[in-house]
Amino acid sequence: MSERLIQLAANLKKVLGKRIQSVEIALGEVTVVVYADTYFESAMLMRDDPSLAFEQLIDLCGVDYQDFRDGAWAGQRFGVVSHLLSLEHNWRLRVRVFAPDDSYPLVASVSPVWNSANWFEREAFDLYGILFDGHDDLRRILTDYGFIGHPFRKDFPISGNVEMRYDPELKRVIYQPVTIEAREITPRIVREEQYGGPV
C-alpha cells in the first residue's frame, strides 16, 4: 500500500473527524464515505484545508444501489459519488454520500463549493431523481421536459412509459403510450467455402 494513500487517509481522518462514516484504501484509491448531514461542511473542509486542498471536482454522479451485488446491499438505496483532485498534492479522492430517505433522496448541493458540480448534479437529478438542497437551477438536463420518471433507476421500466414520434398529419411531435410488438428474429446463415479459412 502506498505511503501517499496512507497519508491522505490520515489527513482525511484528522480534518473531517466524526463527519466520516468510513475510509477505505482499495485498488490504489482512497474512498471516504461522509454522513449526509455533514456533506456540505465536509466538502468545504476538503477544499479549504491546506493538508487536503481538493480544489477541483472532476466528476459527480448518482448511483442506485437497489439489487447491488445480487440484492445483498443493506444500506440506503441512493448515493452520490464525487471524484476530487488536489493539484497541490497530486491526490485523487472518491467521496461517497448516501441519501438518508429512499423515498425522497435528498443531499446537499456542492455546486457552491465547486462550480463544476452544477451540471453533474442536474444530471443526477434527471436520471436518478436525487434532489440537491441548495442547487439554484435543479431541472432536467438530458431528458425531455415532459418526461415521466427517472430512467437510470433500477425500477424504471426498460421499455419506458411513452414514446415520442413525429405525426405528419398534425405536423408536430406527439407522445403516445409505448407499443412493443413481439417479433421473431431469424439469424442469417453464411455458407461459403472459404469462410473463416485462409485467404
Curated annotation (Swiss-Prot):
SUPFAM superfamilies: Nqo5-like. GO terms for cellular component: plasma membrane. InterPro entries: NADH_DH_suC, NADH_quin_OxRdtase_su_C/D-like, NADH_UbQ_OxRdtase_30kDa_su, NADH_UbQ_OxRdtase_CS. It is a peripheral membrane protein. One of its GO terms (molecular function) is NADH:ubiquinone reductase (non-electrogenic) activity. It holds the Pfam family Complex1_30kDa. It is found in: Cell inner membrane. Its main location: membrane. It comes from the Bacteria. It is an enzyme of class 7 (translocase). Keywords: Cell inner membrane, Cell membrane, Membrane, NAD, Quinone, Translocase, Transport, Ubiquinone. Its EC number is 7.1.1.-. Transmembrane segments: none annotated. It catalyses: a quinone + NADH + 5 H(+)(in) = a quinol + NAD(+) + 4 H(+)(out). NDH-1 shuttles electrons from NADH, via FMN and iron-sulfur (Fe-S) centers, to quinones in the respiratory chain. The immediate electron acceptor for the enzyme in this species is believed to be ubiquinone. Couples the redox reaction to proton translocation (for every two electrons transferred, four hydrogen ions are translocated across the cytoplasmic membrane), and thus conserves the redox energy in a proton gradient. Belongs to the complex I 30 kDa subunit family. NDH-1 is composed of 14 different subunits. Subunits NuoB, C, D, E, F, and G constitute the peripheral sector of the complex. This is NADH-quinone oxidoreductase subunit C.
